[in-house]
Amino acid sequence: MHKPLFQKTFITNRRFMAEPLNKPKRPPQIRTGLTDTGVKKAADKSARTRAREFALQALYQHLVGRNDADSIDAFTRDLVGFHKADSAHYDALLHGCIEGASALDAVITPLLDRPMAEISPVEHAVLWMGAYEFRQCLDVPYRVVINECIELAKAFGGTDGHKYVNGVLHKMAPSLRAAEVAADQTK
């Protein structure tokens, strides 16, 4: 007997299609650092991005649970993956946002179209982080701050929370990073 050169393959419309038996297999597709949902894979995240994620979770605990910074800090440092985060940036964000909460709220509140009480805790924490980084982390370009905050809001916030965060931070940037925004607009 001879070996068949083709095998029948079932197609959804109940027809068969001839397919070669020795058809070469395609190599698996190499993904470029994104999951199926478009979120960065954990292996591709920078230490600062990880620090922002842990800081956001810690600030959420502070806003919702009213826990003190030291107990939140101890809890967060025990979480899986924290060793890959930039702990200095995490400390600056967590303690800086909690200690400067009233000053950060004073910067954020005039830019809101609703009372602060109606902002979700995730968006509130992301806005705190954005305002803090605008004021204190001058080595981070303002566009990076906005982008990182948008990504945090997409990953942890409500459906359209990232759009709201984007709008507020774009209004905030010219007042806190005036020279940088002006230089960027002249390009």
UniProtKB/Swiss-Prot annotation:
Region: Disordered, residue numbers: 20-41
GO CC terms, sorted: cytosol
A biological process term (GO) from this entry: DNA-templated transcription termination
Gene3D superfamilies: NusB-like (1.10.940.10)
GO molecular function, one term: RNA binding
Keywords annotated in UniProt: RNA-binding, Transcription, Transcription antitermination, Transcription regulation
InterPro entries: NusB-like_sf, NusB_fam, NusB_RsmB_TIM44
Pfam families, alphabetized: NusB (PF01029)
Transmembrane portions of the chain: none
Domain of life assignment: Bacteria
General function of this protein: Involved in transcription antitermination. Required for transcription of ribosomal RNA (rRNA) genes. Binds specifically to the boxA antiterminator sequence of the ribosomal RNA (rrn) operons.
Family: Belongs to the NusB family.
PANTHER family: ANTITERMINATION NUSB DOMAIN-CONTAINING PROTEIN, N UTILIZATION SUBSTANCE PROTEIN B-RELATED
Stated name of the protein: Transcription antitermination protein NusB
Organism: Polaromonas sp. (strain JS666 / ATCC BAA-500)
